[in-house]
């Protein structure tokens, strides 16, 4: 029984170590586009075991709100917004069709990891979008 307890503790520590290694990067840091343009925001992640992939939008002075999520390879479209996910290349992106001034905001990508210490949502650094 003691051996099982030690094994479980080691497994828990390994899962936490793996979770702490996730790195989420966004590009570009900022983007200015004309009204009506097609806009692309990019996100890369370092752990292919990630489960859910999110885009959040935060308007100035407001809390971030979940915009869209995806969990399997391919694309998902909602109105003018499309998410593309390719787990093999550790990349997902948000595409905005017919950009509007109301789309101006900070966009944050995030990755959900499941592990021994619970679920973790790890955010990218953000892309500030200005539509002129």
UniProtKB/Swiss-Prot annotation:
<protein>
    <recommendedName>
        <fullName>T-cell receptor alpha chain V region 2B4</fullName>
    </recommendedName>
</protein>
<dbReference type="InterPro" id="IPR036179">
    <property type="entry name" value="Ig-like_dom_sf"/>
</dbReference>
<dbReference type="GO" id="GO:0042605">
    <property type="term" value="F:peptide antigen binding"/>
</dbReference>
<keyword id="KW-1279">T cell receptor</keyword>
<keyword id="KW-1064">Adaptive immunity</keyword>
<feature type="region of interest" description="D segment">
    <location>
        <begin position="114"/>
        <end position="117"/>
    </location>
</feature>
<keyword id="KW-0393">Immunoglobulin domain</keyword>
<dbReference type="InterPro" id="IPR051006">
    <property type="entry name" value="TCR_variable_domain"/>
</dbReference>
<keyword id="KW-0675">Receptor</keyword>
<dbReference type="InterPro" id="IPR003599">
    <property type="entry name" value="Ig_sub"/>
</dbReference>
<feature type="region of interest" description="V segment">
    <location>
        <begin position="21"/>
        <end position="113"/>
    </location>
</feature>
<keyword id="KW-0325">Glycoprotein</keyword>
<feature type="signal peptide">
    <location>
        <begin position="1"/>
        <end position="20"/>
    </location>
</feature>
<dbReference type="InterPro" id="IPR013106">
    <property type="entry name" value="Ig_V-set"/>
</dbReference>
<dbReference type="InterPro" id="IPR007110">
    <property type="entry name" value="Ig-like_dom"/>
</dbReference>
<dbReference type="GO" id="GO:0002250">
    <property type="term" value="P:adaptive immune response"/>
</dbReference>
<keyword id="KW-0391">Immunity</keyword>
<dbReference type="GO" id="GO:0042101">
    <property type="term" value="C:T cell receptor complex"/>
</dbReference>
<keyword id="KW-0732">Signal</keyword>
<dbReference type="InterPro" id="IPR013783">
    <property type="entry name" value="Ig-like_fold"/>
</dbReference>
<feature type="glycosylation site" description="N-linked (GlcNAc...) asparagine">
    <location>
        <position position="42"/>
    </location>
</feature>
<dbReference type="Pfam" id="PF07686">
    <property type="entry name" value="V-set"/>
</dbReference>
<feature type="region of interest" description="J segment">
    <location>
        <begin position="118"/>
        <end position="132"/>
    </location>
</feature>
């Amino acid at each position: 029984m003691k051996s099982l307890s030690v094994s479980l503790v080691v497994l828990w520590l390994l899962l936490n170590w793996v979770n702490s290694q996730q790195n989420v990067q966004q590009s570009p840091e900022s983007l200015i586009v004309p009204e009506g343009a097609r806009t692309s925001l990019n996100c890369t992640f370092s752990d292919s075991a990630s489960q859910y992939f999110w885009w959040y939008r935060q308007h100035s002075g407001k809390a971030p709100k979940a915009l869209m999520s995806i969990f399997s390879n391919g694309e998902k479209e909602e109105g003018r917004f499309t998410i593309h996910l390719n787990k093999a290349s550790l990349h997902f992106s948000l595409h905005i069709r017919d950009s509007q001034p109301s789309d101006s905001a900070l966009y944050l990508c995030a990755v959900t990891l499941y592990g021994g210490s619970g679920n973790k949502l790890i955010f990218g650094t953000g892309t500030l979008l200005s539509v002129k």
